[in-house]
């Protein structure tokens, strides 16, 4: 039997060991939380085949109901890893996102987006596709496929498990069967929706001061298209005659509409769109570097007048309602028609108004 003093020493030693272990675990846990959440977190997906793929959970997500899920779980039936190269502007990347989601589901593959696409879309929408870590992207043995802008039969049976898509797909033929899912992916964050609705609530009809019954979003694409369309594609952008005819189409069918005009050429719009009836509001800010305010306004309208471009397409697609678009905006021999099929670009129920091609007649082949 040990003397009492020895027993006390042993008990004290054991107590110190236990307290030290507890202190270590507490500090380790706190340090993990502090540093782990302050940096990007890698969430390994152990179900993937070699090479291992990780979901890249960006800092601060999810922090509120408005943010995207950081590590969503793919159904167990899906395999492989597909992504798409983010290219172009806001509307282009929306088309790439929707097409990736649809084709991956069709082929039973898991879809991931790259950080640049997340940076472009996540501040605006509640997107849910996980983000691929750059180091995993660089190690993956990708097969590459450049898509054309309409659904083809071969896209329904793509066998590559590691596929990186590219191109500028924005055709409803890829994803319209998933329309509600696509609309859900492109749900605006609350603050953007509320700000847009606040702008619309303040609008009044000029002559009577009454509240509008119907909001028609108008997107007028100008900017670089002023040179690109005639010089490269033998095409035109919308003129004032088209916009007048499109507005008259809605005036004939809807009571007391108001036209909410957005554009990357607002000065031209103010000078060329007839606002004398008191039902035209120049609401857009025209900021191409931060287009989401204009986009949010358009999607909260009941109907849409679009000209050309993917920005207008997505505004119309998400708003629903009636859509009027600029039709036949290139000469018949335009190279543009080799990469663009109107029947795959515009929904069948949308209403087309032919463009005025007279400025292009000097370019027409005899």
From Swiss-Prot:
Transmembrane segments: 9-25
Leading EC class: transferase
Keywords for the protein's UniProt record, in alphabetical order: Glycoprotein, Glycosyltransferase, Golgi apparatus, Lipid metabolism, Membrane, Signal-anchor, Transferase, Transmembrane, Transmembrane helix
Membrane topology of the entry: Single-pass type II membrane protein
Keyword Cytoplasm: no
GO BP annotations, alphabetical order: carbohydrate metabolic process; fucosylation; lipid metabolic process; olfactory bulb development; positive regulation of cell-matrix adhesion; positive regulation of endothelial cell migration; positive regulation of endothelial cell-matrix adhesion via fibronectin; positive regulation of sprouting angiogenesis
EC annotation from Swiss-Prot or TrEMBL: 2.4.1.69, 2.4.1.344
Localization of this protein: Golgi apparatus, Golgi stack membrane
Role this protein plays: Catalyzes the transfer of L-fucose, from a guanosine diphosphate-beta-L-fucose, to the terminal galactose residue of glycoconjugates through an alpha(1,2) linkage leading to H antigen synthesis that is an intermediate substrate in the synthesis of ABO blood group antigens. H antigen is essential for maturation of the glomerular layer of the main olfactory bulb, in cell migration and early cell-cell contacts during tumor associated angiogenesis. Preferentially fucosylates soluble lactose and to a lesser extent fucosylates glycolipids gangliosides GA1 and GM1a.
Name this protein carries in UniProt: Galactoside alpha-(1,2)-fucosyltransferase 1
Organism: Saimiri boliviensis boliviensis
């Amino acid at each position: 039997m040990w003397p009492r003093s020895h027993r006390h020493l042993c008990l004290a030693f054991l107590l110190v060991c236990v307290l030290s272990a507890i202190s270590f675990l507490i500090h380790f846990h706190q340090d993990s939380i502090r540093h782990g959440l302050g940096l990007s977190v890698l969430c390994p997906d152990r179900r993937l085949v070699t090479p291992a793929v990780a979901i890249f959970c960006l800092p601060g997500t999810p922090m509120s109901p408005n943010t995207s899920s950081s590590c969503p779980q793919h159904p167990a039936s899906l395999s492989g890893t597909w992504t798409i190269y983010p290219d172009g502007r806001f509307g282009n990347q929306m088309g790439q996102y929707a097409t990736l989601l649809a084709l991956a589901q069709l082929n039973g593959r898991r879809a991931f987006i790259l950080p640049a696409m997340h940076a472009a879309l996540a501040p605006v929408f509640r997107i849910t596709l996980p983000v691929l870590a750059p180091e995993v992207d660089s190690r993956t043995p990708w097969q590459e496929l450049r898509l054309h802008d309409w659904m083809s039969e071969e896209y329904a049976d793509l066998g590559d498990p590691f596929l990186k898509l590219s191109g500028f797909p924005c055709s409803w033929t890829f994803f319209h069967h998933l329309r509600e899912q696509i609309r859900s992916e492109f749900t605006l964050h609350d603050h953007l929706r509320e700000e847009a609705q606040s702008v619309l609530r303040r609008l009044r009809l000029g002559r009577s001061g009454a509240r509008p019954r119907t909001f028609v979003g108008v997107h007028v694409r100008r900017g670089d298209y002023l040179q690109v369309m005639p010089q490269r594609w033998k095409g035109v952008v919308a003129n004032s005659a088209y916009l007048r005819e499109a507005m008259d189409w809605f005036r004939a069918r809807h009571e007391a509409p108001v036209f909410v005009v957005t554009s990357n050429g607002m000065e031209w719009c103010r000078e060329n769109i007839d606002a004398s009836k008191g039902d035209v509001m120049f609401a857009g800010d025209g900021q191409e570097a931060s287009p989401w305010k204009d986009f949010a306004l358009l999607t909260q309208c009941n109907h849409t007048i679009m000209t050309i471009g993917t920005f207008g397409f997505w505004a119309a697609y998400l708003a629903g309602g009636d859509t009027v678009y600029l039709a036949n905006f290139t000469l018949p021999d335009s190279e543009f028609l080799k990469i663009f099929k109107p029947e795959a670009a515009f929904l069948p129920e949308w209403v087309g108004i032919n463009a005025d091609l007279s400025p292009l007649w000097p370019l027409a082949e005899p």
